[in-house]
């Protein structure tokens, strides 16, 4: 697949975005903590309230990725903090063909690298890329003593993807 990553401004309307950030900041300590990534995280199957915010993004994703058939697979909210916060180089191996990473909040920006290109996202900006095909990572977590970074990972796949029991099952 040939796709040029795209930065998307104002992923959410301002009032919706502010509500999402407020809910995530209040709730993150209730979610599982993954020591290997230095993050609290939860998916939208376990925290169904997240679906209120991610479901409306389907139309935007279809437009960005130029596919009228893609479907939402799952989303994850992640809150990174401390010395262990990291995201090593990887390609996704789950139902992440189309990925929209949205910056919810940050005290110090933490850039995202995709295929060797660095992206600094502002709050309510997203980066669209092919999560399963494009290597992506983050470098050292900036200001680990004070920094907190909230990210929303929204993933989409085609209907014949194994996630939906399709040809790749």
Predicted regions and their residues:
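Short helix-terminating capping/connector loops at secondary-structure junctions
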Residues: 35, 70, 146-147
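Catalytic core of non-heme Fe(II) oxygenases with the double-stranded beta-helix
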Residues: 80-139, 145-152, 157-168
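Conserved double-stranded beta-helix
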Residues: 40-43, 47, 53-111
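Non-heme Fe(II)/2-oxoglutarate
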Residues: 1-65
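Structural/interface elements that position substrates and couple domains in central-metabolism enzymes
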Residues: 4, 22, 70, 74-75, ...
């Amino acid at each position: 697949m040939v796709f040029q990553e795209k930065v998307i401004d104002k992923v959410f309307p301002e009032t919706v975005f502010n509500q999402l950030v407020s809910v995530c900041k209040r709730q993150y300590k209730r979610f599982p903590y993954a020591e290997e990534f230095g993050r609290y995280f939860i998916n939208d199957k376990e925290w169904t309230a997240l679906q209120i915010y991610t479901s409306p993004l389907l139309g935007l994703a279809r437009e960005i990725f130029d596919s009228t058939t893609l479907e939402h697979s799952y989303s994850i909210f992640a809150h990174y903090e401390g010395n262990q916060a990291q995201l090593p180089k990887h390609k996704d191996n789950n139902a992440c063909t189309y990925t929209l990473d949205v910056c919810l909040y940050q005290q110090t920006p933490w850039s995202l690298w995709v295929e060797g290109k660095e992206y600094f996202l502002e709050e309510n900006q997203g980066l669209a890329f092919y999560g399963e095909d494009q290597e992506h990572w983050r470098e050292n977590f900036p200001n680990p003593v004070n920094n907190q970074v909230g990210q929303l990972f929204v993933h989409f796949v085609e209907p014949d993807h194994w996630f939906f029991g399709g040809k790749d099952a």
